[in-house]
Amino acid sequence: MSNGTNIDVAGAINTLAETFGKLFQMQIDVANTALKALADVAEPLGKTATDLIGSFTGAATQVLQSVSSAIAPKK
């Protein structure tokens, strides 16, 4: 009665579940790598921005001190 074709439903479902699990894990790995790359880029940019603001503040302070001493009455 059987023509020799035997369908392994449990095996097919198991393989499908395993494949979906691997795909999901790969998506998590890609998202993880992307977040790590963003963090690696943001860290030096943040430090550079902080250094730039500090330099600008120092320069502005020196300019204000020079202007103040130029305006101040001489004794």
Curated annotation (Swiss-Prot):
Family recorded in the similarity comment: Belongs to the CsmB/CsmF family.
Sequence repeats: 8-17, 29-39, 40-50, 51-61
Organism, as annotated: Chlorobaculum tepidum (strain ATCC 49652 / DSM 12025 / NBRC 103806 / TLS)
GO cellular component: chlorosome envelope
Entry's Gene Ontology BP terms: photosynthesis
Gene for this chain: csmB
Keywords from the named record: Bacteriochlorophyll, Chlorophyll, Chlorosome, Chromophore, Photosynthesis, Repeat
Highest taxon, organism lineage: Bacteria
Region (4 X approximate repeats): 8-61
Name assigned to this protein: Chlorosome envelope protein B
Subcellular location: Chlorosome, Chlorosome envelope
Lineage: Bacteria, Pseudomonadati, Chlorobiota, Chlorobiia, Chlorobiales
Biological function: Component of the photosynthetic apparatus which may bind the chlorosome to the bacteriochlorophyll a protein monolayer.
Record keyword Repeat present: yes
